[in-house]
From Swiss-Prot:
Membrane-topology annotation of the record: Single-pass type I membrane protein
Keyword check for Disulfide bond: yes
Region (Receptor binding): 122-236
GO molecular-function terms, A-Z: host cell surface receptor binding; sialate 4-O-acetylesterase activity; sialate 9-O-acetylesterase activity; sialate O-acetylesterase activity
Quaternary structure, from the entry: Homodimer; disulfide-linked. Forms a complex with the M protein in the pre-Golgi. Associates then with S-M complex to form a ternary complex S-M-HE.
InterPro entries per the UniProt record, alphabetical: Capsid_hemagglutn, HEMA, Hemagglutn-estrase_core, Hemagglutn-estrase_hemagglutn
Record's protein name: Hemagglutinin-esterase
Organism: Human coronavirus HKU1 (isolate N1)
Chain positions covered by the region annotation Esterase domain 2: 237-349
């Protein structure tokens, strides 16, 4: 019976992938919002940690940059700003919900929130893919050495755009990016028959964009190397970047991990993060159930608490299907894996069917287990005979 039990244990239930975000070692960092903002407790009527989706023991480890009511996308574009800053080899994102269809943002009354959700997808796709190659992330301002007569034609009752800004195009405008390895800047246009370009004066590279389709501010997000750039357009006004995401301290490729950031079903959410988070640069984790918090309906959900609980311990392997605690055997192939990963061959096939070396190792383990049981029975028999 013991042999049968061990056989099925090793073949069908050992070291299955876990639906959590975690890390291979202590060199990790999390970017989040109120669900991981430990300082937000000071602003709450009921001062407890039930609103968190992370374990409170993580609050003072210096590995979290989070702010209630904020998101990296919102801070990138609008006057509502939090300087997300952090460094780590393995990067986790759990934010984004604070800009979604529930806020219904658009530049004009006849504009389109759908355009902004498309902008959100493009932004996070660029953020995730870049962050797989860099350890450090922060915001930087883009200075201009000329006086700019700007106008703001994009704001709502809750948000006001300040990246990019718009100026009348009367002369050439330049900006310089120095100090970081890579920058993410917006290039945005309203619906028109015009185009705009960034020219790298040092290399001659040209980055251009035109928008003749979308009835709102349509943006692409361009990764620029350090250098001096000239802004040119065929339109009567320029859109100028004022803030950039700074990527620094390059590393070997490490996929980022993204946890879905959404409301309870009573509020409208979107799928921008899952669309933006694609292999091979990003692993996406989600709960199959509705978000139902215990502090309030949008804070403290047990499913997402379970996903974030993986931050409490190191794992051996991170993959598309989940994380693996051990590096020995598994019944699920660690697809697009990173770390010290278990051996297996065919997705969703039990290991005992095909992997020859693990079968030999399992046979040795089973024989040792059998000999141990026989030895215990022998000792028990001798003890009774005396």
């Amino acid at each position: 019976m013991l042999i049968i039990f061990l056989f099925f244990y090793f073949c069908y239930g050992f070291n299955e992938p876990l639906n959590v975000v975690s890390h291979l070692n202590h060199d990790w960092f999390l970017f989040g919002d109120s669900r991981s903002d430990c300082n937000h407790i000071n602003n709450l009527k009921i001062k407890n940690f039930d609103y968190l989706d992370i374990h409170p023991s993580l609050c003072n480890n210096g590995k979290i940059s989070s702010s209630a009511g904020d998101s990296i996308f919102k801070s990138f574009h609008f006057t509502r700003f939090y300087n997300y800053t952090g460094e780590g080899d393995q990067i986790i994102f759990y934010e984004g919900v604070n800009f979604n269809p529930y806020h219904r943002f658009k530049c004009f009354p006849n504009g389109s929130n759908d355009v902004w959700l498309l902008n959100k997808v493009r932004f996070y796709r660029a953020l995730y893919s870049n962050m797989a190659f860099f350890r450090y992330l922060t915001f930087v301002d883009i200075p201009y050495n000329v006086s700019l007569s700007k106008f703001n034609s994009c704001k709502s009752d809750i948000l006001s755009l300040n990246n990019p800004i718009f100026i009348n195009y009367s002369k050439e405008v330049y900006f310089t990016l120095l100090g970081c390895s890579l920058y993410l800047v917006p290039l945005c246009l309203f619906k028109s028959n015009f185009s705009q370009y960034y020219y790298n004066i040092d290399t001659g590279s040209v980055y251009g964009f035109s928008n003749v389709v979308y009835p709102d501010l349509d943006c692409i997000y361009i990764s620029l190397k350090p250098g001096s750039y000239k802004v040119s357009t065929t339109a009567p006004f320029l859109s100028l970047p004022t803030k950039a995401l700074c990527f620094d301290k390059s590393k070997q490729f490490v996929p980022v991990q993204v946890v879905d950031s959404r409301w309870n079903n009573e509020r409208a959410s979107d799928i921008s993060l899952s669309v933006a988070c694609q292999l091979p640069y990003c692993y996406f984790r989600n709960s199959s159930a509705n978000y139902v918090g215990k502090y309030d309906i949008n804070h403290g959900d047990s499913g997402f608490i379970s996903i974030l609980s993986g931050l409490l311990y190191n794992v051996s392997c991170i993959s598309y299907y989940g994380v693996f605690l051990y590096d020995n055997f598994t019944s699920i192939w660690p697809y697009y894996s990173f770390g010290r990963c278990p051996t297996s061959s065919i997705i969703k096939h039990p290991i005992c069917v095909y992997d020859f070396l693990p079968i030999i190792l399992q046979g040795i383990l089973l024989c040792l287990a059998l000999l141990f049981v026989v030895f215990l029975l022998f000792l028990l028999y001798n003890d009774k005979s005396h």
